[in-house]
Amino acid sequence: MTNAKKETSLLTEREWQVVRLIQQDKKYREIATELGLGYETVKTYATRIRRKLNLTSKVAVALWAQKKRKSNG
């Protein structure tokens, strides 16, 4: 499995939903409202996403998602 596929398959569908909204520059409270989740739950998802992808910030997650989108066409 390539590194890109390995990274992509690490995330659950819900984590991907959070990533897409982070990429749209949404705040955690906005993401929580949009997905019908609690604020702390969204923060937990964001932390898990950063750990799984070995990233250190919300901005890094957005940049990673943008790169993935471009590479997938």
Label each residue range with its predicted role.
Residues 2-40:
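Helix-turn-helix DNA-binding segment
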Residues 1, 44, 70-71:
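Generic low-polarity alpha-helical segments
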Residues 27-60:
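Recognition helix of helix-turn-helix DNA-binding domains
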Residues 5, 51-73:
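Basic, Lys/Arg-enriched C-terminal extension of HTH/homeodomain DNA-binding domains
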Residues 16-20, 50, 62:
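Hydrophobic residues on short alpha-helical segments
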